[in-house]
Regions:
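Active-site-proximal beta-alpha loop/turn segments in soluble metabolic enzymes
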Residues: 23, 37-41, 62, 120
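A short, charged helix-loop
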Residues: 26-29, 33-50
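Glycine-/charge-enriched secondary-structure boundary and capping motifs
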Residues: 61-62, 66-178
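Internal active-site segments that recognize and position negatively charged phosphoryl groups
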Residues: 15-18, 49-73
């Protein structure tokens, strides 16, 4: 089965594998000697990402859409909802990220790093709510954190923080401009 970006359906859950933002954080601190130890750790996420091929194969049996997070989840999720002709609610406080980022990235740049940065190569996928136990099973089977970060709506892309609607203007990474 081939997973496309265009299959998301109203009320599907939105998930992401792994943690986001580490590759972008590595780029943000690479020249800052204060964070040389952290950069040494984070650069592996930038230079040697782990492709999620096996879990992608398993997801193809039930997920409704999927995309690799290469341009930042903000931009990649926009691709899913655009091609699926729907919207999404994203709960920013649910998005998993390496807690080291709290120490090295200024608070006002944290979301840009976590959802606007690219090169994570995790998977963002949608699935019918009835498959939530199967998602948990795949997380254990592949020893990969899978986190529900939102749900598909009829229209618009909305971001929430602590259950409050907030305005974000993140473009994500563009390989042709950056």
């Amino acid at each position: 089965n081939i997973l496309y970006r265009s299959g998301a359906k109203f009320d599907d859950d939105i998930y992401v594998t792994g943690e986001l933002g580490s590759a972008r954080a590595a780029l943000m601190v690479k020249d800052n000697k204060k964070y040389s130890k952290e950069f040494k750790y984070l650069k592996k996420f930038l230079h040697t990402p782990k492709p999620r091929i096996n879990i992608g194969i398993d997801l193809s049996k039930f997920a409704t859409s999927c995309i690799d997070v290469s341009d930042g989840i903000a931009k990649d999720l926009k691709n899913i909802i655009s091609e699926s002709k729907c919207g999404a609610n994203i709960y920013l406080d649910k998005i998993p990220f390496n807690k080291i980022l709290n120490r090295i990235i200024e608070r006002n740049n944290l979301y840009e790093c976590i959802i606007g940065g690219g090169e994570d190569y995790e998977l963002c996928f949608t699935a019918n709510k009835s498959y939530s136990k199967r998602v948990k099973y795949l997380s254990k089977k592949h020893n990969i954190k899978i986190t529900k970060i939102g749900n598909i709506t009829e229209e618009n892309l909305n971001y929430y923080e602590n259950d409050k609607l907030i305005k974000l203007s993140l473009k994500g990474f563009d390989h042709f401009l950056n």
